[in-house]
From Swiss-Prot:
Its main location: endoplasmic reticulum. It comes from the Eukaryota. This is S-adenosylmethionine-dependent nucleotide dehydratase RSAD2. CDD domains: Radical_SAM (cd01335). One of its GO terms (molecular function) is metal ion binding. Residues 49-71 are annotated as: Disordered. Interferon-inducible antiviral protein which plays a major role in the cell antiviral state induced by type I and type II interferon. Catalyzes the conversion of cytidine triphosphate (CTP) to 3'-deoxy-3',4'-didehydro-CTP (ddhCTP) via a SAM-dependent radical mechanism. In turn, ddhCTP acts as a chain terminator for the RNA-dependent RNA polymerases from multiple viruses and directly inhibits viral replication. Therefore, inhibits a wide range of DNA and RNA viruses. Its EC number is 4.2.-.-. Induction: By interferon type I, type II and LPS. The gene is RSAD2. It is found in: Endoplasmic reticulum membrane; Golgi apparatus; Endoplasmic reticulum; Lipid droplet. Keywords: 4Fe-4S, Acetylation, Antiviral defense, Endoplasmic reticulum, Golgi apparatus, Immunity, Innate immunity, Iron, Iron-sulfur, Isopeptide bond, Lipid droplet, Lyase, Membrane, Metal-binding, Mitochondrion, Mitochondrion inner membrane, Mitochondrion outer membrane, S-adenosyl-L-methionine, Ubl conjugation. Acetylated by HAT1. HAT1-mediated acetylation of Lys-198 in turn recruits UBE4A that stimulates RSAD2 polyubiquitination leading to proteasomal degradation. 'Lys-6'-linked polyubiquitination at Lys-207 leads to RSAD2 protein degradation.
Length: 362
């Protein structure tokens, strides 16, 4: 009997508070719901801002996303020297230094790139055949194909310093040789800065085409369309040479390289409009191997390594270097490359680039 008294008393006491508490809960309920919804909206807004890249720092969406997602260096352009025997007026990688990495250090960097996912390496300059008469380049080409077993090894050259003996020693390890040719008019080549005294740039191009066929190297042509060649019709010449690709670039200005106070070139006189570039492309629309690249496509869609193996970020119209991959590794350095992988794929940056897969009729 006495044990039930406290329980009964407690139940009666609780019953006296049920109605007031219920009233309080019903009045506070909407307030709690409103606060919860407000916090949810605030969190949602922050999430949407992150997805859209609208940060307080005002960073663009690509920069915000790229800082968290690793970039694979599928295709890399290694400008291991800035030295050149030509003086092309629009050149955007000029001879500001004479530095070239020791061979073993260059190989170490290439090994790091391979481990990070590199499939294609393109050697450029400057003029890549100028250093050690092409032997340094040849050893890197052989290393990349034999030891790294890269699917594609290519070179961009003006062609003036290449000898047949180089093909005999290293041709089997090279997939693609791209030769720069901006005009089939020798007077225009002189105006541009590709004149070499008694040497004829066009005749040399034809000789190199023959060597590429003889030594089973895919032949490619690169042309920079500028004020002096924009009216030219190159259709018949290109068809006769029959390259696997004819890369056509719009003349590009880069602060500190070919425009501005610190530049070694003054390329403003070579610049053409987007409309003029489109007219040139339309004139050559029947050339099946034509691959055009406007300034917009070109600026952010290349992974460029300089002579110190630093990635060069060209997003702001100049070349801002990262730290060297030899010092900080590929993953850290590539975050500062400014590389736009979507544009790389959109411009056709990934194609059949191994001569084993090209199935050419040598």
């Amino acid at each position: 009997m006495w044990t039930l008294v406290p329980v009964t008393f407690a139940l009666r006491l609780l019953s006296t508070f049920v109605q007031p508490l219920g009233s309080l809960g019903s009045s506070l309920g909407p307030l709690f719901l409103w606060l919860w919804a407000a916090f949810w909206r605030a969190g949602g807004d922050r999430s949407r801002q992150q997805l859209q890249g609208k940060t307080e720092a005002g960073e663009p969406p690509r920069a915000q996303e790229d800082s968290h997602l690793p970039t694979t260096p599928t295709s890399v352009n290694y400008h291991f020297t800035r030295q050149c025997n030509y003086k092309c007026g629009f050149c955007f990688h000029t001879a500001k230094t004479s530095f070239v990495l020791p061979l073993e250090e260059a190989k170490r960097g290439l090994w790091l790139l391979k481990e990070a996912g590199m499939e294609k390496i393109n050697f450029s300059g400057g003029e890549p055949f100028i250093h050690d008469r092409g032997e340094y380049l040849g050893k890197l080409v052989r290393f990349c194909k034999e030891e790294l077993q890269l699917p594609s090894v290519s070179i961009v050259s003006n062609g003036s310093l290449i000898w047949e003996r180089w093909f005999k020693s290293y041709g089997e390890y090279l997939d693609i040789l791209a030769i720069s040719c901006d005009s089939f008019d020798e007077q225009v080549n002189v105006l541009i800065g590709r004149g070499q005294g008694k040497k004829n740039h066009v005749e040399n191009l034809q000789k190199l085409r023959t060597w590429c066929r003889d030594y089973k190297v895919a032949f490619k042509i690169n042309s920079v369309i500028n004020r002096f060649n924009v009216e030219e019709d190159m259709t018949e010449h290109i068809k006769a040479l029959n390259p696997v690709r004819w890369k056509v670039f719009q003349c590009l200005l880069i602060e500190g390289e070919n425009v501005g106070e610190d530049a070694l070139r003054e390329a403003e006189q070579f610049v053409i409009s987007d409309e003029e570039f489109e007219e040139f492309l339309d004139r050559h629309k029947d050339v099946s191997c034509l691959v055009p690249e406007s300034n917009r496509q070109m600026r952010d869609s290349y992974l460029i390594l300089d002579e110190y193996m630093r990635f060069l970020n060209c997003r702001n119209g100049r070349k801002d270097p990262s730290k060297s991959i030899l010092d900080v590794g590929v993953e850290k350095a590539i975050k500062f490359s400014g590389f736009d992988e979507k544009m790389f794929l959109k411009r056709g940056g990934k194609y059949v680039w191994s001569k084993a897969d090209l199935k050419l009729d040598w």
